[in-house]
Amino acid sequence: MNKIFAAFKPRGLSSNAFLSTLKKKYKNKKAGYSGTLDPFAKGVLIVAFGQYTKLFRFLKKTPKTYKATLWLGVYSLSLDDQNIKEIKNIKEFDLANLQQIIDQMQGIISYTPPQFSAKRINGTRAYELAKKGIEANLKPCQMEVFDCKILSYNHPFLNIEITVSEGAYIRSYCELFARKLGINATLSSLERIKEGKFVYNNEKSLNVLKYIDLKPNFIKELNKLENGAKIFVEELEFHDEGDYYIETEKYFSIINIKENTVKYLLNKVEKC
């Protein structure tokens, strides 16, 4: 069964554990997801079954929108509601001051990923090292903050909605935000509400061609796609280099054009 949909991962489950529940629910062993959510986080997780598990790299998954609660005055090794080492009662901040920092932290931001993250260090996940008390040497990264707004402030909890690029860490944003205030802070909750155009809709099966980040191309002899026959660039409507999808009534294929040569990236993927 080919299927792609937006699931809602609950808090307290790893993304892998949640995927296992979906495999059992839909009786489908070939399944995958994109965009790992930490166990303490909840929200939209893109899930695919069957041949559609090969399509993640072609999906438009950015920007991503989250709702987050920053717990001001708290020091956590993992920047979430676990591994808390210190809780301080700090003075309440002026809302205008908080808004000023929000405004400053727009655009491209440099950051270091959290020690408790899925980044790999010589094949080992950083969080596995962190659990053993080993500090990983994580390289600085960049994320783009497209928009951020304050939803509410009930000291010491600051609720925000933030839209960011793929690969961004909201925990790192929280750390940088707190640093500008001269305090520690951690996330007490995190929910992903949107990933690209994907929003939760009761696990409704989606038309994947509306969600892939590719332009359509066209060929007169559609039977070539059905048979996986060699395609020449002159047979296509568009000749510019790049990736495209071509569809028939029941199937679609993804091709690449480079140096006047056409290559199948995926062929004869059945529509759901």
UniProtKB/Swiss-Prot annotation:
Family annotation (Gene3D superfamilies): Pseudouridine synthase
UniProt keyword list: Isomerase, tRNA processing
HAMAP family membership: TruB_bact
GO MF annotations, alphabetized: RNA binding; tRNA pseudouridine(55) synthase activity
Native source organism of the sequence: Campylobacter jejuni subsp. jejuni serotype O:23/36 (strain 81-176)
EC numbers, comma separated: 5.4.99.25
Protein's UniProt keywords contain Isomerase: yes
InterPro entries to which the protein is assigned, alphabetical: PsdUridine_synth_cat_dom_sf, PsdUridine_synth_N, tRNA_psdUridine_synth_TruB
A matching Pfam family: TruB_N
Record-annotated membrane-spanning stretches: none
Gene: truB
Keyword tRNA processing: yes
Biological process according to GO: mRNA pseudouridine synthesis; tRNA pseudouridine synthesis
Catalytic residues, chain numbering: 38
Name by which UniProt lists this protein: tRNA pseudouridine synthase B
Enzymatic reactions: uridine(55) in tRNA = pseudouridine(55) in tRNA
Role of this protein: Responsible for synthesis of pseudouridine from uracil-55 in the psi GC loop of transfer RNAs.
Similarity section: Belongs to the pseudouridine synthase TruB family. Type 1 subfamily.
PANTHER family: PSEUDOURIDYLATE SYNTHASE TRUB1, TRNA-PSEUDOURIDINE SYNTHASE
